[in-house]
Regions:
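Domain-level signal for soluble alpha/beta catalytic cores
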Residues: 1-326
């Protein structure tokens, strides 16, 4: 905050019962989140001024489990965690963060969008039960220069997957350095009516696990984002220090934030790839045999946990020409 940050995160990236189970600290999860939010809020209030208010984002990490990827090569249908397991854990975390008086919620470092959706669903449940709402930020992570998340989604597919939620912002953090992140930030910027955030690492870690990009190096790279009108929110992830934040704040003061584009209303779908249906699109084939309400066979396969055969039904639909499966 003293370096010039407008928003600070709570120290709760791993603040779920799922992540804390590795340390036998499940019973401490409420206190971890509540106290972290409370302390951060007290400091933010202390440093805030009428001209520059400061805000606290409740940090919600991806957990150390994935709902979309099997850890067993020999059993692709196996999962360490279910959607409901994640939803319940995230709900506990969100309740504690809100009780600690955070100003917004940040679902960050998303490598599996299904995990993210569980967090967003949990947030919506808590909002309804507590009759309170705060802004929601979502930040994914592109694993490498293939341009995909760990679960295989492109940047646009990731955007489409969460755009049903009225987010404050969407963006990327971690994993890549600033320059490598640029094309994916631009893609979000061009195709989203949400604010865009970017808080990359200080480059990639070296052989000693340390980060080499200085505040000046990162500042020049992020200045390109600002000068090009790509972002509304900037910051730093792994390897960044108060010196980095001070440099970002100094540079950001010179530029206007990105203008929100007005986009045409279109059907936007996503799997691992994005599909946008436009007036110019050819006929869109939808395969409906993977619908438990429309196919007795598929419903039986799902009830019997025969996911290998269920997958073959989906594959047959795609090979028969379906661009979308229902």
């Amino acid at each position: 905050l003293q370096a010039g940050a407008d928003i600070i995160e709570t120290n709760t990236f791993s603040g779920t019962t799922i992540s804390q189970s590795d340390y036998k600290l499940e019973s401490a999860v409420y206190d971890i989140n509540f106290q972290s939010a409370k302390i951060a809020k007290e400091v933010a209030i202390e440093i805030s001024t009428p001209e520059k208010p400061r805000f606290v984002a409740g940090a919600i990490g991806p957990t150390n489990r994935t709902a979309s990827i099997s850890p067993k090569v020999e059993d692709p249908s196996f999962r360490h965690i279910t959607f409901d397991d994640l939803r319940i854990a995230y709900k506990q975390q969100v309740e504690a963060l809100l009780d600690g008086n955070v100003d917004l919620l940040l679902v960050e470092t998303v490598f599996d969008t299904l995990n993210c959706k569980a967090a967003l669903f949990a947030i919506s449940e808590v909002f309804e039960e507590k009759e309170i709402e705060v802004p929601i930020m979502v930040s994914g992570t592109i694993t490498d220069e293939s341009g995909r998340t760990l679960s295989g989604q492109t940047a646009e597919a990731f955007l489409n997957s969460v755009s049903h939620i009225p987010l404050l912002s969407i963006g990327f953090n971690c994993a890549l350095g600033t320059n490598a992140m640029r094309p994916y930030i631009k893609e979000l910027s061009d195709k989203s009516e949400f604010f865009i955030s970017a808080y990359p690492n200080a480059g990639l870690p070296n052989e000693m696990g340390e980060y080499d990009e200085t505040a000046e190096i990162m500042g020049k790279q992020l200045e390109d984002f600002m000068n090009s009108g790509l972002v509304n929110i900037v910051g730093g992830c792994c390897g960044t220090t108060p010196d980095h934040i001070a440099e970002f704040a100094r540079i950001a003061a010179k530029y206007k934030a990105r203008e929100i584009p007005t986009l045409k209303t279109q059907m936007k779908l996503s799997g691992l790839e994005a599909v946008t249906v436009t007036e110019e699109s050819n006929f869109l084939n939808i395969g409906e045999r993977t619908n438990v309400m429309g196919s007795i066979k598929f419903r039986r396969l799902i009830k019997e946990d025969d996911f290998e055969q269920a997958l073959s039904v989906a594959l047959q639909q795609v090979e028969s020409g379906a661009q979308v499966i229902d």
